[in-house]
Amino acid sequence: MTTKTRFAPSPTGFLHVGGARTALYSWLQARANNGEFVLRIEDTDIERSTQAACDAILEGMNWLGLTWDEGPYYQTKRFDRYNEIIAQMLAKGTAYKCYCSRERIDALREAQAANGEAQKYDGCCRDLPARDTDEPFVVRFKNPIGGSVVFDDHVRGRIEFSNDALDDLIIARTDGVPTYNFCVVVDDWDMGITCVVRGEDHINNTPRQINILKALGAPIPEYAHVSMILGDDGAKLSKRHGAVSVMQYRDDGYLPEALLNYLVRLGWSHGDQEIFSLEEMKQYFKLGDINKAASAFNTDKLVWLNQHYIKSLAPEYVATHLQWHMDDQEIDLSNGPALAEVVTALAERAKTLKELAASSRYFYEDFAEFDEAQAKKHLRGVALEPLQLVQQKLAALTDWTVEAIHQAIEDTATELDVGMGKVGMPLRVAVTGAGQSPGLDITLFLIGRSRSEQRISKAIEFVADRINS
């Protein structure tokens, strides 16, 4: 039997990291077993579902590279199918119409609460004969009485629920709209889902869904309920812990490889290995290796992984993701080096692509002023002679190459009998406007000959003015 999994988010908000991890685990379960992965949008909550949220979910999945084989399916486009099954269940007696008013249900719950009883429907309409009336009604599933529902969860082991603890679930509201728990069952059945991977908050839904599947004569899928993600303070992860939307991480400068690597390790492990490519994830992933304890989100670990991938992935690939940040920061690339060359130069120091983009501006744009603190420290009177001499040596170069530039800087220090720092720091501030950059040879090479010479002249003028003031 072909393994078939699904990711079924509700479009009531953006794709958050908890949902992304569930999607990743479900995707890996399919890919690790040469199976199929289905994307389904569970939009039966019509009032809260939005197109913007749906678009954001698809954008997040595409950015992460979690491709799907079927879908996206939308539940709101399948209402005819759900109503067809409900009609069959009413005819077979596995569902019934409930005419209890809201007032009666509220009074029942209040009485049960006052008596310390579990709050559930009492089956008032369960065995009543059919009515020919215009009274409003809901449709309820006739849950089995007695016995229990047992399933073996890939993460949590054997789980058992007493049927007597379950009430007769509403499967269609008074307006005729089918409910979430019912739609999920029909969808999983129709789509041939063999393994359901979802959050632990759905555990209580599982016995109800299994009972409906049994009533329909449908196969029961396997289940894996993964634990929630906590903030570093032990509380449930929320906006106050920082970015929680997947695309916010894109905006903050993280690579999808870093986020995927971080998320897969947030509850799953393979020995002591920390770095996993997608291919390695597919090779090693098993649902049974997921830890059932909650996992704490650690931003420092994510930053570390992001640094690793910025440095280790092909510069040309990193540049495709960096392009978004260059556009976002309005850095015009038309007058400067190839972006992949800048990635190669700056990758060693960069924590995020957002930082990398900001620190690359001087390769493409001239700066109006030198950093005040750096100029005060390095563009003093003693910098005049080194700047003038290095300018002469650079101007004399036949070829503008990294090697030739390096030799010119080194020759300047030798001729003046000073350390490289006495030449390098004033030169760095001169050409970048700041105090940090990659090696000066590659920095000047990427900035270009004409622009480098202009900036050195500007720095010489700045130092001369300070001497004369």
Curated annotation (Swiss-Prot):
Q: Which UniProt keywords apply?
A: Aminoacyl-tRNA synthetase, ATP-binding, Cytoplasm, Ligase, Metal-binding, Nucleotide-binding, Protein biosynthesis, Zinc
One Gene Ontology term of the biological-process aspect is:
glutamyl-tRNA aminoacylation
Q: Which InterPro entries match?
A: aa-tRNA-synth_I_cd-bd, aa-tRNA-synth_I_codon-bd_sub2, aa-tRNA-synth_I_CS, aa_tRNA-synth_I_cd-bd_sf, Glu-tRNA-ligase_bac/mito, Glu/Gln-tRNA-synth, Glu/Gln-tRNA-synth_Ib_cat-dom, GluQ/Sye
Family annotation (PROSITE patterns): AA_TRNA_LIGASE_I
Name the coenzymes or cofactors required. Answer: Zn(2+)
Write out the residues that bind Zn(2+). 98, 100, 125, 127
Q: Where is this motif: 'KMSKS' region?
A: 236-240
Describe its partners and assembly state. Answer: Monomer.
Similarity comment text for this entry: Belongs to the class-I aminoacyl-tRNA synthetase family. Glutamate--tRNA ligase type 1 subfamily.
Name the UniProt record assigns to this protein: Glutamate--tRNA ligase
> From what organism does this protein derive?
Shewanella baltica (strain OS155 / ATCC BAA-1091)
Organism taxonomic ancestry: Bacteria, Pseudomonadati, Pseudomonadota, Gammaproteobacteria, Alteromonadales
